[in-house]
Amino acid sequence: MKYLSIIILSFGLLLSCKKPKDRVEKREDENSKLTVKEHFAVATNVSSWKNYKEKRVDDSTKFVSGNFNNYYITGFLDSKGKKKDWWNITDKNNDKSVKLLYEIIGNNEEISQYIYYNSKEIDKTKSKFYEKKKIDSDTYRMIFHTPIGFTKTNQQGDFGYYLNCDNEKKGIIDVKCDMEKGYYYTDIKNIEKCSKINIIGAFFELYQDGDGNFVENTIYVKESLK
């Protein structure tokens, strides 16, 4: 991807993306003025919860839970009070819920993935997440889902990553993903020779919305393939 640059850090990665001036972050819905991060900011602010509880997991992490309006929320905070890992927001009045994956990128909290559920079934029209699928002994397919309930033109998806094969870093690879209805995918090949292999990187979707603005979606990836 023209604007993609990946800088590898000890934890995993820090991603920077040179943006056109009119590019905007993904909105919660097409008519919303809030980004996804802003949309969930109030509900995941523990200072606004009732029946707040916390439990120390280790020296750097604590598990928190509480109630906000009609929602029961659980998640994790790091030693600086920043949100990390998977958070769950459950509507106490129905069978709907959402899972959020927070990543610390630089000093910022970013929502890398969010998955909406209806009756425990994933609502792929609203969700942003990735999954892996084993094709054969030498190939894994990385599948990236982004919300499809939006006007999208000039879509493209790019995946920048490196492989860690038996603790040896295998360069940085940028690929343009193939696209099916509602998702993107790319195949990771030639992994059979590795006894242990991890993939670390980021997927970027770029498109124009109904107003002609450039909109981006980012999914950070840190996954064991075997």
Language model regions located:
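Low-complexity, intrinsically disordered regions enriched in charged/polar residues
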Residues: 7-8, 34
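Hydrophobic h-region of N-terminal signal peptides that target proteins for export
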Residues: 8-17
